[in-house]
Amino acid sequence: MSSTQFNKGPSYGLSAEVKNRLLSKYDPQKEAELRSWIEGLTGLSIGPDFQKGLKDGVILCTLMNKLQPGSVPKINRSMQNWHQLENLSNFIKAMVSYGMNPVDLFEANDLFESGNMTQVQVSLLALAGKAKTKGLQSGVDIGVKYSEKQERNFDDATMKAGQCVIGLQMGTNKCASQSGMTAYGTRRHLYDPKNHILPPMDHCTISLQMGTNKCASQVGMTAPGTRRHIYDTKLGTDKCDNSSMSLQMGYTQGANQSGQVFGLGRQIYDPKYCPQGSAADGAPAGDGQGEAPEYLAYCQEEAGY
């Protein structure tokens, strides 16, 4: 089985766009630094093509044995594809045991099929940084040294004192003050004498936030509990029947409380203002002989008041 059977065909469309974007992030300068670092530690030559020189996994496994002896016990030097892929898998496992972060690792096909050489470059740079953090000295300054943990132990008194400190993320309270604030639980006044605002005369004063009552008046309003008349004779309302609704519902200029008795039930009409009609209206004008008993009893009750 030849290695060409593992190679992919040309990419088109979105796949080609993604591949080109990954290739654009590849740094040739970092490749030269990695080449010098790997060849300096292993003593092996990678060759002119960086990908083809590392795809068999022999140089990478040798590099891991230099960084951590015995991490790759067996290195396959066969030209078979599965042996080369096995070397790459052993190298990735050795990087995990060396302390590499999973996000910094690459897959075997990324290097073997040249699928994502940018990720391979990132992984090797992270490996160089991890080796520098562990104190490896090499002639090539490559990789970033990781910072070490700086743990601090505080006693209980210090931890409790820190709970009273306002963090800088919350702002500052240097200029904060409660000067002039009323004590908690006291009444809140609607005026301030320092601002030359007139104090309210009594508890019935309506503040400006509620509007104004300068034009409000209760002139002509009936007392609570009294009877409501359907019409008002002073306004010239026609006396059609006992179910007619007059303008009293929206107009009170001519209303008065003369002749009203408080505490009585509310009647639909008042016989003093709603007579039974005249002879001209088609009704017989009598002296009350033909009235209904209920109406006569009501008239006697009204006359008693």
Curated annotation (Swiss-Prot):
The modification N6-acetyllysine is found at K8, K25. It holds the Pfam family Calponin. Residues 28-132 form the Calponin-homology (CH) domain. Belongs to the calponin family. Calponin-like repeats lie at residues 166-191, 206-231, 245-269. The keyword Phosphoprotein applies. One of its GO terms (biological process) is regulation of actin filament-based process. Thin filament-associated protein that is implicated in the regulation and modulation of smooth muscle contraction. It is capable of binding to actin, calmodulin and tropomyosin. The interaction of calponin with actin inhibits the actomyosin Mg-ATPase activity. The gene is Cnn2. The modification N-acetylserine is found at S2. It comes from Mus musculus (Mouse). GO terms for cellular component: stress fiber. GO terms for molecular function: actin binding; calmodulin binding. This is Calponin-2. Gene3D superfamilies: Calponin-like domain. The modification Phosphoserine is found at S138. Keywords: Acetylation, Actin-binding, Calmodulin-binding, Phosphoprotein, Repeat. Smooth muscle, and tissues containing significant amounts of smooth muscle.
